[in-house]
Amino acid sequence: MEAQQVAEPRLPGGATPTEDLPTRVKTVADVAADHAIAVDSAARFPAEAFHAIKARRLLGIQVPKALGGEGVGIGEVADVCYQLGQACGSTGMIFAMHQIKVACVMRHMGENATLQRMLRRLCAEQLRVAASTTEGQGGGNIRSSEAPVEHREDGRITLERKASVISYGAYADGVVTTARRAADAAASDQVLVTLLKSDYTLTRLQGWDALGMRGTCSEGYTLKASASAEQILPEPYENIHARTMVPFAHLLWGSVWTGIAASATAQAQAFVRNAMRRGGQLPPGAPQFTRALATLRTLRGMLTDSLRRYEQCMNDPQALAGLDFQTLIAVTKVEASELAAQTVMHALRACGLSGYRNDSEYSIGRHLRDVLSAPVMINNDRILANLAMPVLMSPMAASLHD
């Protein structure tokens, strides 16, 4: 299906926003909410929302000021994801995915001048970056790559990989992709490669007719690239994965899911209030609203605690590699995805048939379909299975304060 065309805003290089971040985010969220139903029903890219995101210069907010960004921390980025998630799950998830890749480049580029220039350009032109980390039969195992980087004598590289999913790939200005370091390298010996649109072609392999998150347009492609070797991040992907990729992904995805859950809970609250006004008594589903509110509070508390823990150790490689943190960040994803789904189900039951109907002002259908993507975005069972052996020998806490 063709995406609705929305004219891209023209941005002067180096222009700075005239409004504060909360005002800009509120404006964008309003636009995203206005078009969320159309994006979902047509399974189309949320063009209007990203027109507004680009116009209000949100794509480079976490890039350091020295490179043209605003130097915003992960806590503020997570809050943007939360607010966009309330408005439109697909918009929030695309924004989160973009920011995850920006963080990987920003935190691991070292003194690489080519990558610094790319970040400057991203901020100046408000470029949108997609991710290519799933491949072939590997599916969600992003710590394994089939396709190798091929190095040429002229200092350039080539890469061809069959990506089972590149979310919003057709609408991106660049792709950040994993790859095997070389043809003779092990599948787990990976690098991260940054590509701009002029560096690659995408050949569509499969479409995206999914239950939810329909606007992410997460189609499959064959990616063929030719680029400078300087576009490879200097650090091994193993380090990037543990220190940035996984923490940012789990925390920003979790923020989007929490936003979806909050929006569903607000729908349930509005339904219960309206029923009270019209009938003079609580509707049968009112206790489910209380349960939705309780699980939402648990979810928000867990997520903000995990954000705080990451902010405290995000520049400490030893702490990030430790079992305690790796367990925390993995369990955060599992618990956030399941609590968000529980919250939305409680909200649906609070609204009853009005929540079940797609043509109701209290419909929870889109929220439910979007949030059900959460447990299968890197399958929870895979995460728990990977944790099973490492945590088996971990001591149980002897005190509430341990």
Question: At which residue positions do the language-model features occur?
Answer:
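Glycine-rich phosphate/pyrophosphate-binding beta-alpha loops
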Residues: S164-G169, A249-L252, M377-I378
